[in-house]
Amino acid sequence: MRGVWPPPVSALLSALGMSTYKRATLDEEDLVDSLSEGDAYPNGLQVNFHSPRSGQRCWAARTQVEKRLVVLVVLLAAGLVACLAALGIQYQTRSPSVCLSEACVSVTSSILSSMDPTVDPCHDFFSYACGGWIKANPVPDGHSRWGTFSNLWEHNQAIIKHLLENSTASVSEAERKAQVYYRACMNETRIEELRAKPLMELIERLGGWNITGPWAKDNFQDTLQVVTAHYRTSPFFSVYVSADSKNSNSNVIQVDQSGLGLPSRDYYLNKTENEKVLTGYLNYMVQLGKLLGGGDEEAIRPQMQQILDFETALANITIPQEKRRDEELIYHKVTAAELQTLAPAINWLPFLNTIFYPVEINESEPIVVYDKEYLEQISTLINTTDRCLLNNYMIWNLVRKTSSFLDQRFQDADEKFMEVMYGTKKTCLPRWKFCVSDTENNLGFALGPMFVKATFAEDSKSIATEIILEIKKAFEESLSTLKWMDEETRKSAKEKADAIYNMIGYPNFIMDPKELDKVFNDYTAVPDLYFENAMRFFNFSWRVTADQLRKAPNRDQWSMTPPMVNAYYSPTKNEIVFPAGILQAPFYTRSSPKALNFGGIGVVVGHELTHAFDDQGREYDKDGNLRPWWKNSSVEAFKRQTECMVEQYSNYSVNGEPVNGRHTLGENIADNGGLKAAYRAYQNWVKKNGAEHSLPTLGLTNNQLFFLGFAQVWCSVRTPESSHEGLITDPHSPSRFRVIGSLSNSKEFSEHFRCPPGSPMNPPHKCEVW
């Protein structure tokens, strides 16, 4: 791997998790639930981790039946391991082709406990692979979904907690700032003393909020500038700095649609289906207004209804995500002067000069906008809306974002709405989980060195690099056999695959205390003032964003912190990134059979690699520039191939609600391509190294084990409400169909499991892109 060296300040945009350049991720970015996948709780901040007072009540709150069941499960698991160990002793001399090491016995136990062998694998492979896991893992309290990603994140959280609570003299100043931030979050006594005062004072400084008191400042432009730059809210539209898609060597101001409090426009527009959520959202708004001193509910509710109606008007002009997938069509570069003509409701030059100060912006400043029609319509909406309502809406954006940093009453309001929105049940999660999550989201690179030193073996980078090379080789082998692609485009595609840059574990700069301290030099965390620390961070992170404008993008910037259980592909950098957090079981274990590692981390690598060639990634060349580098004949052939997948996944449904095959197309292409590349890489490994020993008692070949390992990565459960939210917001298909969809397209899977032609897992017509 090439050296990772981001200059301290330019690295900070990604180090803070604040970069907004496009990326394609392995899984949903939220590992737990948030009120919104965007503006409401940015940086992935999750509200549902907050404990009422203490996590110690969790066991006590269990019924006697629940306690007995927990004990029984533990005893059964111990018995299973003991039986497998006994089998290992009994057959050790009989079957040299069977792996009987402690690691093999342990992983076999885990696989068996997750399976449901009563299900026909040719009928429903997801239930066959995950049926046991699903029965043993109901959605935990405080969550609306649970799976292997969540489980691994919990493990990482526990490590981070220990590191934050046990300071050492050798930590850097940046690491100490993360510890101060965490401890302020944990100081519930001080938070309860302050109650709503910090936010109420902030609202007063902004000129008031008609919902809680006199509104004395009729200055729309000033308020918009302050809430955008100092508190990183995005009412009406979002403004950020990122690599120019058509000139990836330079950063540019970018403007896009934004401003909804709920996760998707669908919640506002499909009122009958989402009546419960809309009612719950309004009640939540009213409750926060009361907690902030609004007094009489009869006076608050009509004004909050007006805000909700305004958000509904925003939803009406917001473009659905599935119609924004062709980036060549939605990309428009204009000057600041042209933007003023396009959306005259905003005084753009004063706005941009204020939020990007001290950088000077003039009328010729290039700006990329992703939907001209939206900006025209939002400008009209602003000009035709009462100024008091506009101010109420902007302050509501601020309240949504910051109320979770206040006392327990606000947490209770959050949790009540979470139950309506996501089906999240009562919470008995300890406070530290909320604080670890928030600290990691905001200061994840500051605490990154602690996590890396505690968890990441240095040779893991070289091991992961080798896996990536094997997957890339397999992908290029498949690329050479495609019949629908012309030779010229194929050659360019291979050059792009060769040029993909690998980032593994962590960026090297975080391990240099001096460089890390430079990154966070301008951020100060103060003891015992949690709300203040969060507000300082928002202001600090925007200053870092503004600082990027006149600097070139840095290939070595990261958009995920080391503990994250995820991975991503960046099209403007043509790079794939695998944080240390995902380089663990069940994705990778050095003592596990290669079949499982290729089915785990191998498919993850293949997934991200294939994103370079999905319906959006394929539009970018090897240098990360958005341009038409395919011949027209191959473009048309690609579209025909992908339509098969759109139709296939659109026929899947959850609780009677269909999957959006077009919105999920990119992820489905990556899932299918990643599985194919990983399987081929495993076959190449076997040819080179010989067949490995099989696991005991499973009765499965290693090729079957590869597919089983892949499927068990996606074992998960969700509440009906969370499933609905995922279907309308998430670009990934539901876990069940990530397994069934990919495997039913794999002829190798059907061959190894001997699935009869026409069976559900071996349909007569299979979709294949890569």
Curated annotation (Swiss-Prot):
Compartment(s) of residence: Cell membrane
Q: Which residues form the active site?
A: E608, D671
* InterPro entries for this protein: MetalloPept_cat_dom_sf, Peptidase_M13, Peptidase_M13_C, Peptidase_M13_dom_2, Peptidase_M13_N
Q: How is the cofactor bound?
A: Binds 1 zinc ion per subunit.
* Assigned GO CC terms: early endosome; endosome; endosome membrane; external side of plasma membrane; extracellular exosome; lysosomal membrane; membrane; perinuclear region of cytoplasm
Query: Where is the major localization of this protein?
Result: membrane
Q: What Pfam families has UniProt attached to this entry? A: Peptidase_M13, Peptidase_M13_N
Query: Which reactions fall under this protein's catalytic activity?
Result: Hydrolysis of the 21-Trp-|-Val-22 bond in big endothelin to form endothelin 1
Disulfide links within the chain: C99-C104, C122-C755, C130-C715, C185-C435, C644-C767
Record: glycosylation sites? N166, N187, N210, N270, N316, N362, N383, N539, N632, N651
Q: What does the activity regulation annotation say?
A: Inhibited by phosphoramidon. Activated by K49-P1-20, a twenty-residue synthetic peptide shortened from the snake B.asper myotoxin II.
Please give the annotated consequence of changing C428S.
Abolishes dimerization
Tissue occurrence: All isoforms are expressed in umbilical vein endothelial cells, polynuclear neutrophils, fibroblasts, atrium cardiomyocytes and ventricles. Isoforms A, B and C are also expressed in placenta, lung, heart, adrenal gland and phaeochromocytoma; isoforms A and C in liver, testis and small intestine; isoform B, C and D in endothelial cells and umbilical vein smooth muscle cells; isoforms C and D in saphenous vein cells, and isoform C in kidney.
Spans within the Extracellular topological domain: 90-770
Name the source's superkingdom: Eukaryota
Residues on the Cytoplasmic side?
1-68
Residues in domain Peptidase M13?
Answer: 98-770
Function, in words? Converts big endothelin-1 to endothelin-1.
Name of protein? Endothelin-converting enzyme 1
The UniProt gene name for this protein comes to ECE1
